[in-house]
From Swiss-Prot:
Family: Belongs to the krueppel C2H2-type zinc-finger protein family.
Keywords of this entry: DNA-binding, Metal-binding, Nucleus, Repeat, Transcription, Transcription regulation, Zinc, Zinc-finger
SMART domains from the UniProt entry: KRAB, ZnF_C2H2
Magnesium as UniProt keyword: no
Function per UniProt: May be involved in transcriptional regulation.
Gene this chain is encoded by: ZNF571
Organism: Pongo abelii
Name this protein carries in UniProt: Zinc finger protein 571
Record has Nucleus as a keyword: yes
Subcellular location: Nucleus
A GO term for molecular function: zinc ion binding
């Protein structure tokens, strides 16, 4: 079988003259070492003693070169590296018929002599012109002998390793060639001879060091044609391109889930096997990923290496800092296709989408209740266990979650960091602000499946859904039933006349605290709910909602008797009295009844 033609140029990295001059001595030495290592890998392919190659001429004459010594080739390569790869080689030997290709050294090296030598040499002789001896930087670890070139050291170490062949065979992985053996040996010994001058990180292979140094230089030579994103390694680009193609070649045999990256597939399998090889020495908690353990250990150490330059807030994870910075920039790149709502991070979008799909994958084994989020289940389990690990130092009150404690502590400090840009109202937590902003936007994302009524908060929807179910709380005075005990309590005040919420300005009293809050806006002149269409402002959010219907023409309240529609529920109530004949407002003077209080007011003026 004929030998395949493989050139050293196929595995070499070239520099132009200008690029070569820009390299400092340390970089040139590193480059030299890498080229020698690459050549060592080539020379290990059973072509050390003899090889055949075709002469690059029309005649295609075959030249045979036998017994070409490995050390001579190493010196020749060193000569190339010292003066830059690609330069013409010179020698004083009489080697007519051989040539040095500018396209790269063939494995069975061809050398052209431009000057005829005075002495005669055979093709198997060593080169007449050798590289000047330089400092012997390369030391043998076995006998401490020094060498000028790494190639000579590798060949020398080969002689030592002949004695250890019997031991090497006992290993699972055996290597017949020197470079592979050296790399394998470093894996077992943990030796990392290639150290980064920038950060001190060490590597077992010089090629790994070169890749690592691109982090410091910010060099990313591999660019994606689809989105322009650049990468340090070609393998990273290959994996990234699967994002655009949608290719997921790694499929789990257990559940059928597919992955773009092999590493993702490997980690996923630990979910099925339950393997958690990374254990915390402080608390014994185990993790699937080593990075998870690293982040977890920062909880014990209190280390937060990622700090926001805007506000100084620090984080355990770099991803948390990235998400936090979007609070300052306002960037929300993850948009829900169902409702258009945007989010800071992908996990928030995934959790939000479960509202539309109704998916609740986290189920409590105690009571069967299911949740959108895993954290919700964790907190819920503490309801059964009674565990409240987060305690307030001010009042001793304990909480299920740390976030609840932080929010509670703001009651003592008076801190309200979340401020509405529309009306300036401030809140203790971000959730309250988000819910409040829906008053201005009119958004009601939580809809009742029974009647279609929508709400600002999920808590309101939960309360409303009880209307369609049983009503356990009944008023003994009038027989009216209620879903909640608090509703019954407020209702009973109508019969008792109790109005515990009193205005300090005018002594007017109210049944509900919310009524007092709204009333106090009259004294302050505060109208926080403003219409974006015409600028008209209102004391109550419900008044704004009703007003907006004058612009949209919406009339959601329809009479079942005649089909007439109204923009307000109160208008429908008054209208229905026409059909029922109900007249609840009676004149004290003459006993006449009226449907509306305004009609009674006008009538009483006749008596006066």
């Amino acid at each position: 079988m004929p030998h395949l033609l493989v050139t050293f140029r196929d595995v070499a990295i070239d520099f132009t003259q200008e690029e070569w001059e820009c390299l400092d001595p340390a970089q040139r030495d590193l480059y030299r070492d890498v080229m020698l290592e690459n050549y060592s890998n080539l020379i290990s392919l059973d072509l050390e003693s003899s090889c055949a190659t075709k002469k690059l001429s029309p005649e295609k004459e075959i030249y045979e070169m036998e017994s070409l010594q490995w050390e001579n080739i190493g010196n020749l390569i060193n000569h190339h590296l010292q003066y830059g790869l690609g330069d013409n080689m010179e020698c004083k030997g009489n080697l007519e018929g051989q040539e040095a290709s500018q396209e790269g050294l063939y494995m069975c090296v061809k050398i052209t002599c431009e000057e005829k030598a005075t002495e005669s040499h055979s093709t198997s002789s060593t080169f007449h012109r050798m590289i000047p001896t330089k400092e012997k930087l390369y030391k043998c670890k076995e006998c401490r002998q020094g060498f000028s070139y790494l190639s000579c050291l590798i060949q020398h170490e080969k002689n030592h390793n002949i004695e250890k062949c019997s031991e090497v065979k006992k290993h699972r992985n055996t290597f017949s060639k020197k470079p592979s053996y050296i790399q394998h040996q470093r894996i077992q010994t943990g030796e990392k001879p290639y150290e980064c001058m920038e950060c001190g990180k060490a590597f077992g292979r010089s090629s790994d060091l070169i890749q690592h140094q691109k982090i410091h230089t910010n060099e990313k030579p591999y660019q994606c044609n689809a989105c322009g994103k650049a990468f340090i390694r070609g393998s990273q680009l290959t994996e990234h391109q699967r994002v655009h193609t949608g290719e997921k070649p790694y499929e789990c045999k257990k559940c059928g889930k597919a992955f773009s990256y092999c590493s993702q597939y490997t980690l996923h399998q630990r979910i099925h096997s339950g393997e958690k090889p990374y254990e915390c020495k402080d608390c014994g908690k185990a993790f699937i990923l080593g990075s998870q353990l690293t982040y977890h250990q920062r909880i014990h150490s209190g280390e937060k290496p990622y700090e926001c330059k805007e506000c100084g807030k620090a984080f355990i994870l770099g991803s948390h800092l990235t998400y936090h910075q979007r609070v300052h920039t306002g960037e929300k790149p993850y948009i829900c296709k169902e409702c258009g709502k945007a989010f800071l991070c992908a996990s928030q979008l995934n959790e939000h989408q479960r509202i539309h799909t109704g998916e609740k994958p986290y189920e409590c084994k105690e009571c069967g209740k299911a949740f959108f989020r895993g954290s919700q289940l964790t907190y819920h389990l503490r309801v059964h266990s009674g565990e409240r690990p987060y305690k307030c130092k001010e009042c001793g009150k304990a909480f299920i979650s740390n976030s609840n404690l932080i929010q509670h502590q703001r009651i003592h400090t008076g801190e309200k960091p979340y401020k509405c840009k529309e009306c300036g109202k401030a809140f203790i937590c971000g959730k309250q602000l988000s819910e409040h902003q829906r008053i201005h936007t009119g958004e009601k994302p939580f809809e009742c499946k029974e009647c279609g009524k929508a709400f600002i908060r999920v808590a309101y929807l939960t309360q409303h859904e009880k209307i369609h179910g049983e009503k356990h709380y009944e008023c003994k005075e009038c027989g009216k039933t209620f879903v909640r005990a608090t509703q019954l309590t407020y209702h009973q005040r109508i019969h008792t006349g109790e109005k515990p919420y009193k205005c300090k300005e005018c002594d007017k009293a109210f049944i509900y605290g919310s009524q007092l809050s709204e009333h106090q806006r009259i004294h302050k002149g505060e109208k926080p709910y403003e219409c974006k269409q015409c600028g008209k402002a209102f004391i109550r959010g419900s008044h704004l909602t009703e007003h907006l219907r004058t612009h949209t023409g919406e009339k959601p309240y329809e009479c079942k008797e005649c089909g007439k529609a109204f923009s307000r529920g109160s208008e429908l109530t008054l209208h229905q009295r026409i059909h029922t004949g109900e007249k609840p407002y009676t004149c004290v003077q003459c006993g006449k009844d009226f449907r509306r209080p305004s009609q009674l007011t006008q009538h009483t003026r006749l008596h006066n």
